């Protein structure tokens, strides 16, 4: 598997994660947001023809070279310091530059195989690399539900003040 910037050649219409809003956003908005500089989307795709054949042999006959196995989107944002956990808020000025992890989705039939962990690690790495050139104190995410919040917490994200679905991971 490799993670690439989303392009028009990736099969957005064949992606199904089980959450219609995430499917529709990928199909209808992701490339438009990239063109406007709003966000950047990164897609996990099969590494090569050999890996594509391995997926097919493992019971995934519809996975082809340009199939999207999972994706995430990143954007620059600001949050107010008083939204952060109290122990972190005191370290920052009133407005804190962050990288927003706007979406993270995995193909429905690939859930539970570690792909989400790999995409999250890629998102953190890209965010840290970008923060070396453009300031960002951490990664901010709005979890869609309690299960998603628990998922992010197991990778070091902490709840923001007054909202258990808003989570933050300091970069430094």
Where do the PLM segments sit?
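Non-catalytic substrate-recognition and accessory regions of acyl/acetyltransferase enzymes
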Residues: 1-113, 117-172
């Amino acid at each position: 598997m490799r993670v690439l910037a989303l392009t028009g050649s990736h099969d957005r219409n064949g992606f199904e994660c089980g959450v219609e809003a995430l499917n529709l956003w990928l199909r209808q908005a992701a490339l438009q947001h990239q063109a406007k500089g709003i966000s950047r989307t990164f897609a996990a795709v099969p590494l090569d023809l050999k890996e594509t054949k391995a997926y097919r042999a493992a019971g995934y006959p519809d996975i082809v070279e340009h199939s999207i196995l999972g994706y995430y989107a990143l954007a620059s944002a600001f949050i107010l310091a008083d939204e952060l956990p109290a122990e972190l808020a005191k370290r920052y000025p009133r407005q804190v530059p962050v990288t927003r992890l706007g979406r993270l989705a995995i193909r429905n039939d690939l859930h539970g195989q570690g792909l989400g962990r790999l995409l999250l690690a890629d998102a953190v790495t890209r965010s840290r690399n970008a923060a070396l050139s453009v300031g960002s104190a951490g990664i901010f995410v709005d979890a869609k539900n309690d299960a998603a919040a628990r998922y992010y917490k197991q990778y070091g994200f902490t709840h923001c003040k007054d909202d258990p679905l808003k989570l933050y991971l300091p970069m430094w």
